[in-house]
A protein has these predicted regions:
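Carbohydrate-active enzyme catalytic cores, enriched for enzymes
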Residues: 1-101, 157-161
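Extended, loop-rich substrate-binding clefts of extracytoplasmic carbohydrate-active enzymes
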Residues: 52-66, 135-181
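Hydrophobic residues positioned within well-ordered beta-strands of beta-sheet architectures
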Residues: 92, 162, 175, 186-187
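Catalytic core of carbohydrate-active enzymes
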Residues: 68-154
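C-terminal catalytic subdomain
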Residues: 101, 181-189
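Acidic (Asp/Glu-rich), glycine- and aromatic
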Residues: 113-116, 187-191
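Residue-level recognition of well-ordered beta-strand positions that form the cores
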Residues: 95, 165-167, 187-190
Length: 191
């Protein structure tokens, strides 16, 4: 294989080879075969912005000194259990014109009220895909576990866009973000 022939000597070459092989193996689906939900465009950036990737934490950021946009897509944490995590894969946060347009509600409340805790960590309390998915009720033994959401997977991330997916109760949802002339468009795709 061409990549193996190009990068076969040093440890650094081996790491580069692995990176290229991973990129080649990433499959980007033909999204026109999926149901599409297009969200209202958001005017975010009035000037240039930088990108920041925190892959291990699963956060991808576009920002300048006044404006901010991010998406959560990554590992659940605690060896896949989720622990204190929420159902926030593919959820966004957005700050522009001195206002939060979309904001993660945070931990909400640590309480012995399981129903309230589950509400604060649900899809409905985050700015993620609005999927019509009915999760089973989780009891006090499930409060510190994410049973119905997978790790998020980023397929592409660059200055003007993002494409990633996560599975929610067995349903795969892709989220595509494009930024053009400071305007963010978000599209969700599922079968």
């Amino acid at each position: 294989n061409l990549i193996e022939n190009l990068y076969k000597d040093s440890r650094e070459d081996s790491e580069i080879k692995e990176k290229f092989n991973n990129e080649i193996k990433s499959e980007i689906p033909i999204l026109t075969e999926y149901k599409e939900v297009t969200h209202r465009p958001i005017e975010v950036f009035s000037k240039d912005y930088q990108t920041y990737c925190f892959k291990d934490f699963g956060i991808y950021i576009w920002r300048n000194e006044d404006e901010y946009f991010s998406i959560r897509c990554g590992l659940l944490g605690q060896n896949g259990v989720g622990g204190h995590s929420h159902y926030d894969q593919l959820a966004i946060e957005c700050f522009t014109n001195r206002n939060w347009i979309a904001r993660d509600p945070g931990t909400g409340t640590y309480t012995d009220n399981t129903e309230l805790r589950n509400k604060f960590r649900s899809l409905g309390y985050h700015w993620g895909p609005r999927a019509d998915i009915k999760f089973p009720n989780e009891d006090e033994f499930d409060c510190f576990r994410l049973n119905y959401m997978s790790d998020g997977e980023v397929l592409t991330y660059y200055k003007n866009g993002f494409l990633g997916y996560a599975d929610f109760y067995g349903k795969r949802i892709y989220r595509k973000i494009e930024i053009e002339n400071g305007i963010v468009t978000i599209e969700d795709y599922s079968k």
